[in-house]
């Protein structure tokens, strides 16, 4: 092989020309302590609060405490693989999650990584988990209904698109069931649903995913899961990750429903992290900024103005109480942040009244303006009658001889309570709710025995769906009741009653 000197010199010249003298400067620190999802890192003097840090083995962390001589950071992954003395690099970025259409139908962890065994998620869009909530000028007041399919909610505590409505109650009172029913009811309504499971058993999350899949709801849903077996940092960031995924759709003019199940466990995880980071504890050992933990999350739910595409994100946070104590720290915080609350009671649940909603103390502060007119026309009277019934029922326990009007109100109230009962996974469209509640409010059920009310309702709805489908269609399109529609509804009720009572 002959090598000519001029050839060698030209190669050397090329190499000299290509030489790049740029030096990559990487800010590196050293792990001085690690454990329980927390690491303390020496160095990294220029690290920012909330910055993503890279540990060996592809594990990432997030800077939380910027102290004089070290940084306290939470580890987003297996902290057991990190050792003292390991090198940590700054990334110059903040924590982001993948977003977009590709996420729909998938089950992901708090970092947006798939955990459903269906392969990787093909998306090139990312959003930071922390984002500033839209300001007043970028919002529009809530005016469109978000139907849950549950009579007691849609009539008495209605929810609008862009609202934050808290679901609160003890364990085993059906909080998740209300949320899942609401997701199932969004089928065909062009609403993308996100279910964020925080600190739940993996088997419970699997059960919810199966239920959603069985009802065809995974076609428009994303499940973000941070189970009880995962480290506290994952439980802490999961709601923010779910919110970022929802914001991608909201800012593109779409409608989103997001459920945080539940924020009590997120607050407990944040308390754990804060105490491990040696932050000063406050009431119930929670850190001083636990209110901000939830307010900055829930304020991101909004109904956007037409200039920003008129998208919306409706949030249904769930809070678990202990023995019905809604005056505890976290429940009062979230009640004050949200636009209303749905109280679920153990006593009602055990008495067979499901969904176990206490309609007396449940409120919706903005949803009323989102109700369709037909529902407003029947629900106003329903709310009043139920309030009178509760008052009289408490009074009637002490005396037996009641006057006719009192007896009539008690009779009607019993039937109204019965008609508000509903089976799980059977959400009802709004026009059917209107005709059923119309029958109760106008006294058509007063002479039907209480134990026959549910079978009458089934018979009545069967007739409405088959022979009176045009009447339901009219209510759906006109969205209001007039004298003509009232007469048609009353005629239908009377016909069904005659056949039912025989």
UniProtKB/Swiss-Prot annotation:
Site positions per UniProt: Required for activity: 362
Cellular component GO terms held in the UniProt record: plasma membrane; proton-transporting ATP synthase complex
GO MF annotation terms: ADP binding; ATP binding; proton-transporting ATP synthase activity, rotational mechanism
Function per UniProt: Produces ATP from ADP in the presence of a proton gradient across the membrane. The alpha chain is a regulatory subunit.
Similarity comment text for this entry: Belongs to the ATPase alpha/beta chains family.
Keyword ATP-binding included in the entry's annotation: yes
HAMAP family assigned to the protein according to its UniProt record, in alphabetical order: ATP_synth_alpha_bact
Reactions listed under catalytic activity: ATP + H2O + 4 H(+)(in) = ADP + phosphate + 5 H(+)(out)
Name used for this protein in its record: ATP synthase subunit alpha
Major localisation: membrane
Subcellular location: Cell membrane
Membrane topology qualifier: Peripheral membrane protein
SUPFAM superfamilies: C-terminal domain of alpha and beta subunits of F1 ATP synthase, N-terminal domain of alpha and beta subunits of F1 ATP synthase, P-loop containing nucleoside triphosphate hydrolases
NCBIfam families named among the record's database cross-references: atpA (TIGR00962), PRK13343.1 (NF009884)
Keywords: ATP synthesis, ATP-binding, Cell membrane, CF(1), Hydrogen ion transport, Ion transport, Membrane, Nucleotide-binding, Translocase, Transport
Quaternary structure and partners: F-type ATPases have 2 components, CF(1) - the catalytic core - and CF(0) - the membrane proton channel. CF(1) has five subunits: alpha(3), beta(3), gamma(1), delta(1), epsilon(1). CF(0) has three main subunits: a(1), b(2) and c(9-12). The alpha and beta chains form an alternating ring which encloses part of the gamma chain. CF(1) is attached to CF(0) by a central stalk formed by the gamma and epsilon chains, while a peripheral stalk is formed by the delta and b chains.
Enzyme Commission number(s) from the entry: 7.1.2.2
PROSITE patterns tied to this protein: ATPASE_ALPHA_BETA (PS00152)
Binding positions (ATP): 169-176
